[in-house]
Amino acid sequence: MRDELVWIDCEMTGLDLRSDLLIEIAVLVTDADLNILGDGLDVVIHAPDEALDAMIPVVTEMHTRSGLIEEVRASTVDLATAEEMVLDYIRGHVKQAKTAPLAGNSIATDRGFIARDMAKLDDYLHYRMIDVSSIKELCRRWYPRIYFGQPEKGLAHRALADIHESIRELKYYRQTAFVAPPGPSTSDIAAIAAELGPPGKDAADTDSAAGHTTG
């Protein structure tokens, strides 16, 4: 696997894979240290008026406020063209398919629409994903001060702006929640691994406790 990360964010008419449409996709590639490579790409995809008119009120308000609805109506780009544009950008930085993971916030939702509408793009990405929202949820449970102290997010609700927010958020967690490079010493790592024990140890302990009876 390569060190680059492919960051993608999508805007849709809703979250239902059975009926909603992908109307904007943006992409940035970063190196392992989250430095952005290139200018990135933001593509607005045309959708028919009936699809836009069918959006629920909160989504209509969001996309109206951001200006996306009018851009979608004016766009002449279809899904196939958008897919090729995104792939061309990614290939400029990631030469080999299936080597760079997809990164973003709640990225499984975006990947669902990518898999449905842009199979070649989905196939080019590694199957693994880096979801910043997972780190956020762990910080909420383990490091609440980090969670509540995170920088305020913008409310643009546009794909490229959302990617920049996600990269910024991961930089914050890297500096606050992760062990500073080069990480623990080899001896500390070995001690932690030994303390955790072999695979299945926790399950065996649970079974033993469940089977224990007192007289």
From Swiss-Prot:
Give start and end of each Exonuclease domain: 5-170
Compartmental location: Cytoplasm
Which superkingdom?
Bacteria
**What EC number(s) does its UniProt record assign?**
3.1.15.-
Query: Which residue ranges are recorded for the region named Disordered?
Result: 196-215
Keyword check for Hydrolase, yes or no.
yes
The task this protein performs is described as: 3'-to-5' exoribonuclease specific for small oligoribonucleotides.
> What is this protein's name?
Oligoribonuclease
Q: Which organism is it from?
A: Mycobacterium sp. (strain KMS)
Q: What is the lineage of its organism?
A: Bacteria, Bacillati, Actinomycetota, Actinomycetes, Mycobacteriales
In the UniProt record, the gene name given for this protein reads: orn
